[in-house]
């Protein structure tokens, strides 16, 4: 009997230790979207589920992300679980390594980078300055980044094969200001953005502007929304902004009766004047008692070309675990 109890205790201890090194998280959302493009109405229901498995052993960890995504109403995507980000992180002394496959992060100017295999980031800190080398199996993708803080101002410089990227961020009297610039080797392909944030009396206020040279295109999916998915000409079904198009916007966010409410007013100053567009986006988010979150988004895009006017109502039910 004592042996059986001892074996059970050891097994329980080993099981606990094994489980403690593995974490499973995930989320799922279902969206109903009603779109009215100058009187032509469409409806669709999409779903997306994500599962993340994170494991670790000492200073080494592994991240595996899987997804079931029907965002394009594609039968294969709706029924097939696919691998997304898969990477390993570890360290040797002061040197950190991340390698595998993952998407980059969205910015105001650019959408996240295409997921490729063989990605790596080697990084370290020297006297408060962060140094990193990033790339993949293609030599042309290699970049070097230097980042640090000077007198409370965060600075970074990233040298890529065909362009240099600079960011500056800080705050003055409670006003946060962030500047980003992409200096391309080719003529007329530079672009830059400025973001200003300020909070007062329970309201979060923000202003963003993004400027592109005649040969540069803004594709970001952070503050403005997915600029790479903007329909600018329903007649030819052109998607995304034209090169040289500038974007600006003002936003306000607050809490009202237990709901998070925000509004954004966006102006697209298109290269082709007939494609200038004013966008009003209203979003209300509420946590429900059943553990889900309901988000209602209404978007009104008013184009200088009436045929491109579009109203969208999106209802999203989401859960995280």
Label for each model-derived stretch:
Residues 38, 74-76, 182-189, 212-242, ...:
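Solvent-exposed loop segments that connect transmembrane elements
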Residues 79, 91, 182, 191, ...:
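Compositionally biased, intrinsically disordered or low-complexity tracts enriched in glycine
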């Amino acid at each position: 009997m004592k042996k059986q109890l001892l074996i059970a205790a050891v097994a329980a201890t080993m099981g606990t230790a094994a489980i403690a090194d593995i974490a499973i998280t995930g989320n799922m959302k279902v969206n109903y979207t009603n779109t009215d493009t100058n009187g032509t109405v469409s409806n669709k229901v999409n779903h997306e589920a994500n599962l993340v498995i994170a494991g670790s052993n000492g200073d080494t960890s592994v991240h595996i992300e899987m997804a079931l995504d029907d965002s394009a109403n594609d039968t294969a995507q709706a029924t097939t679980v696919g691998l997304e980000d898969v990477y390993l992180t570890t360290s040797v002394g002061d040197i950190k390594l991340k390698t595998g496959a993952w998407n980059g992060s969205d910015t105001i100017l650019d959408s996240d980078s295409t997921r490729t295999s063989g990605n790596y980031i080697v990084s370290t800190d020297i006297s408060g300055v962060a140094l990193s080398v990033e790339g993949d199996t293609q030599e042309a993708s290699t970049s070097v980044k230097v980042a640090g803080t000077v007198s409370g101002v965060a600075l970074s410089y990233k040298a890529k094969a065909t362009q240099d990227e600079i960011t500056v961020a800080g705050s003055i009297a409670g006003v946060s200001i962030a500047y980003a610039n992409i200096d391309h080797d080719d003529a007329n392909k530079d672009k830059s953005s400025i973001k200003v944030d300020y909070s007062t009396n329970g309201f979060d206020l923000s202003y963003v502007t993004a400027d592109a040279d005649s040969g540069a295109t803004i594709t970001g999916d952070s503050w403005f929304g997915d600029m790479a998915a903007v329909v600018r000409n329903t007649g030819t079904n052109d998607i995304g902004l034209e090169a040289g198009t500038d974007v600006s916007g003002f936003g306000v966010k607050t809490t009202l009766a237990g709901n998070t409410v925000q509004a954004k007013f966006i102006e697209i100053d298109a290269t082709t004047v007939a494609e200038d567009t004013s966008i009003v986006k209203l979003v209300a988010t509420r946590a429900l008692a059943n553990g889900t979150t309901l988000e209602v988004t209404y978007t009104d895009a008013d184009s200088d070309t009436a045929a491109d006017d579009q109203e969208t109502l999106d209802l999203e039910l989401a859960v995280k675990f």
